[in-house]
């Protein structure tokens, strides 16, 4: 790993059975590594995490509808992966690209993902720098300071982890070009 790896960014997204890490669980995890300029360097494993039917049946209507339509529930039922196995596969990938503690967690609403990581994938949670690079912060600022630009960027909202990461990277590129003045 070269010195530039210290500037690489880890993009992560989780899909969960709900929003409460005390009762809900992770059902999908994906990662992408970019350079500091947001060019994709590597796509990590995209992993459906097995959860029992008793847990899946407790999901709210939005989760059931969304994750049935996108095929995730079926992938979760077919999966044999535990959260720990998914965590270890993700860490094995990240260790090839980014030094521990050098990258913030990157994505949209990453504080929510981090809550689940601390609960169910603590070794992965500890791999990140303590800072966050949260694209949703820029979205909220644009909504307040320059709302007209929000109509120029649309997301598919497939609610599949890898798609969501790619959209987050593209969204940050959009804000860099149309919202943040870098000169």
UniProtKB/Swiss-Prot annotation:
<comment type="function">
    <text>3'-to-5' exoribonuclease specific for small oligoribonucleotides.</text>
</comment>
<dbReference type="Pfam" id="PF00929">
    <property type="entry name" value="RNase_T"/>
</dbReference>
<dbReference type="InterPro" id="IPR012337">
    <property type="entry name" value="RNaseH-like_sf"/>
</dbReference>
<dbReference type="InterPro" id="IPR036397">
    <property type="entry name" value="RNaseH_sf"/>
</dbReference>
<protein>
    <recommendedName>
        <fullName>Oligoribonuclease</fullName>
        <ecNumber>3.1.15.-</ecNumber>
    </recommendedName>
</protein>
<dbReference type="InterPro" id="IPR013520">
    <property type="entry name" value="Exonuclease_RNaseT/DNA_pol3"/>
</dbReference>
<dbReference type="GO" id="GO:0005737">
    <property type="term" value="C:cytoplasm"/>
</dbReference>
<feature type="domain" description="Exonuclease">
    <location>
        <begin position="9"/>
        <end position="172"/>
    </location>
</feature>
<dbReference type="InterPro" id="IPR022894">
    <property type="entry name" value="Oligoribonuclease"/>
</dbReference>
<keyword id="KW-0269">Exonuclease</keyword>
<feature type="active site">
    <location>
        <position position="130"/>
    </location>
</feature>
<keyword id="KW-0378">Hydrolase</keyword>
<comment type="similarity">
    <text>Belongs to the oligoribonuclease family.</text>
</comment>
<dbReference type="GO" id="GO:0000175">
    <property type="term" value="F:3'-5'-RNA exonuclease activity"/>
</dbReference>
<keyword id="KW-0963">Cytoplasm</keyword>
<keyword id="KW-0540">Nuclease</keyword>
<dbReference type="GO" id="GO:0003676">
    <property type="term" value="F:nucleic acid binding"/>
</dbReference>
<dbReference type="GO" id="GO:0006259">
    <property type="term" value="P:DNA metabolic process"/>
</dbReference>
